[in-house]
From Swiss-Prot:
Pfam families referenced in this protein's UniProt entry, alphabetically: WD40 (PF00400)
Cross-linked residues, Glycyl lysine isopeptide (Lys-Gly) (interchain with G-Cter in SUMO2): K84, K183, K201, K517
Keywords carried by this UniProt record: Isopeptide bond, Nucleus, Phosphoprotein, Repeat, rRNA processing, Ubl conjugation, WD repeat
Upper taxonomic lineage: Eukaryota, Metazoa, Chordata, Craniata, Vertebrata
Species for this entry: Homo sapiens
Record-level GO cellular component terms: nuclear membrane; nucleolus; nucleoplasm; nucleus; Pwp2p-containing subcomplex of 90S preribosome; small-subunit processome
Positions annotated as WD repeat: 249-288, 293-333, 339-380, 381-419, 421-462, 471-512
Name used for this protein in its record: U3 small nucleolar RNA-associated protein 18 homolog
Span list, region Disordered: 1-70, 111-143, 193-219
Modification Phosphothreonine occurs at: T204, T221
Domain of life: Eukaryota
């Protein structure tokens, strides 16, 4: 290269200007392999560089144009909406919903359920694809005739199934018919379909609602399931427990069954001259102690209000036995000063533990001090005293007479506050008051139990019963309210299985008690509920103290 040209190239490089080239000429370093090499062929089309992406300014212009178009559409739609009458706008909102700011939602609704079937339901794409690729269900190649024939079940040779036969032609039943018959028998015994056996269809919510519910569920801690505080009517959930006196069996009639007011203990007494105490566990009920009273068939035994004493009377004696549980001493009360009764049998203890009421002969009621066993005073009614009881506050005494009348006495003044005729009663047999001071129940000789409001018994001369229970046909000899005043137990000792449990305040009878087919209750002479209604016990003439666990109540 000449020296002048080299100098010119150096000057051009320093100044930043490129040397002038003739048109159609290429630099030597691109045209050949080297400065002096032969020219190369142009690169193939596959090696060309991709076209450059649009610049950010162009993208911004496109976004602005789309936004401007959306604004124009929104303005035009609003103008059209202004021209529509209010009725038409309301109708569109009811049909299409509120899609004022969401045109895509309107389009999805107009597409119909066909599009919704293919919408994503929350599953992954793989799961959705797998659901669509299920092979069609294949039909069986052949059908076995023996499989289609219904298998017949013999009803005659099974003693349990024989009772379910309605007539002699049902000596054999198919499995389906037997299943239906068993279902009918169960519902008849339970008084309907239990809540746990009901098959109710629950409505499924949308995905958004379920997610909201899940969020609400996770926002708090604690118990989400709680039992109802009030006892439902219809069916009483209960189960049979071991007999209370299983560890001391007897064949003599049980005259008294009572739960201890403070401990998990039940007392059983009867005509076998013994008072027995058992620990209640529902399984074995181990015996704690038995007190034998010689030649003293027990008519009634009862705990004191504080649970420290047991009082017992006999069928043919005027002696009142008092057993001190703390000291372990048996104290006989042979004679009460001023009391001229030859036989002391029926008595009641006041809820506050202050008084002892003895039902005498010739219509006399004797009030004694519980602590000293001394006579305070006497009250007299017309006719014979059939039954008596204290009010829940221990301030009043209710007495049922043999003439079908009910007397209400004031304990402090020993004056008669009211007197009324028990509706439909020829002569009374039993009476009971609820612990909440709301109800008075009167049982008569014709099997009717009238339930009154206590306020009406105090204020009205002819009160009307809230409800007359007519489920018994013989004289009602036992009445007992449970501590929560939700159950009234009624029974008659004159007929087998004559015991019912009445739901309050509906005054309806629980349909699943007693189970008539079992027939293990027999003649009921006494009943009682545990302090918190967890257990129910009754004594019969066969010497058994039957006990049941009431599942609605969690405590003893």
């Amino acid at each position: 290269m000449p020296p002048e040209r080299r100098r010119r190239m150096k000057l051009d490089r320093r100044t930043g200007a490129k040397p002038k080239r003739k048109p159609g000429m290429r630099p030597d370093w691109k045209a050949g392999a080297g400065p002096g090499g032969p020219p190369q062929k142009p690169a193939p089309s596959s090696q060309r560089k991709p076209p450059a992406r649009p610049s950010a300014a162009a993208a911004a212009i496109a976004v602005a144009a789309a936004e401007e178009e959306r604004r124009l559409r929104q303005r035009n739609r609003l103008r059209l909406e202004e021209d529509k009458p209010a009725v038409e706008r309301c109708l569109e909102e009811l049909v299409f919903g509120d899609v004022e700011n969401d045109e895509d939602a309107l389009l999805r609704r107009l597409r119909g359920p066909r599009v919704q079937e293919h919408e994503d339901s929350g599953d992954s794409e793989v799961e959705n694809e797998a659901k669509g690729n299920f092979p069609p269900q294949k039909k069986p190649v052949w059908v076995d005739e023996e499989d289609e024939d219904e298998e017949m079940v013999d009803m005659m040779n099974n003693r349990f199934r024989k009772d379910m036969m309605k007539n002699a032609s049902e000596s054999k039943l198919s499995k389906d018919n037997l299943k239906k018959r068993l279902k009918e028998e169960f519902q008849h015994a339970m008084g309907g379909v239990p809540a746990w056996a009901e098959t109710t269809k629950r409505k499924t919510s949308s995905d958004d609602e379920s997610e909201e519910d899940e969020d609400d569920l996770l926002q708090r801690t604690g118990n989400f399931i709680s039992t109802s505080t009030s006892l439902p009517r219809g069916i009483l959930k209960m189960k049979n427990c071991q007999h209370a006196n299983a560890e001391r069996p007897t064949v003599a009639r049980i005259s008294s069954v009572q739960f201890h007011p403070g401990a998990q203990i039940v007392m059983v007494a009867g005509l076998d001259n013994a008072v027995s105490l058992f620990q209640v566990d529902g399984k074995t009920n181990p015996k704690i102690q038995s007190i034998y009273l010689e030649r003293f068939p027990i008519f009634k035994a009862c705990f004191s209000a504080n649970g420290e004493e047991v009082l017992a009377t006999s069928t043919h004696s005027k002696v009142l036995y008092v057993y001190d549980m703390l000291a372990g001493k048996l104290i006989p009360v042979h004679q009460v000063r001023g009391l001229k009764e030859k036989i002391v049998r029926s008595f009641e203890v006041s809820p506050d533990g202050s008084f002892l009421l003895i039902n005498g002969i010739a219509g006399y009621l004797h009030l004694l001090a519980m602590k000293t066993k001394e006579l305070i005073g006497s009250m007299k009614i017309n006719g014979r005293v059939a039954a008596s009881t204290f009010s829940s506050d221990s301030k009043k005494v209710y007495a049922s007479s043999g003439d079908g009348e009910v007397y209400v006495w004031d304990v402090n003044s020993r004056k008669c506050l009211n007197r009324f005729v028990d509706e439909g009663s020829l002569y009374g047999l039993s009476i009971a008051t609820s612990r909440n001071g709301q109800y008075v129940a009167c049982g008569s000789n014709c099997g009717v139990v009238n339930i009154y409001n206590q306020d009406s018994c105090l204020q009205e001369t002819n009160p009307k019963p809230i409800k007359a229970i007519m489920n018994l046909v013989t004289g009602v000899t036992s009445l007992t309210f449970n501590p929560t005043t939700e159950i009234l137990a009624i029974a008659s000792e004159k007929m087998k299985e004559a015991v019912r449990l009445v739901h309050l305040p509906s005054c309806t009878v629980f349909s699943n008690f007693p189970v008539i087919k079992n027939k293990n209750i027999s003649h009921v002479h006494t009943m009682d509920f545990s302090p918190r209604s967890g257990y129910f016990a009754l004594g019969n003439e066969k010497g058994k103290a039957l006990m049941y666990r009431l599942h609605h109540y969690s405590d003893f």
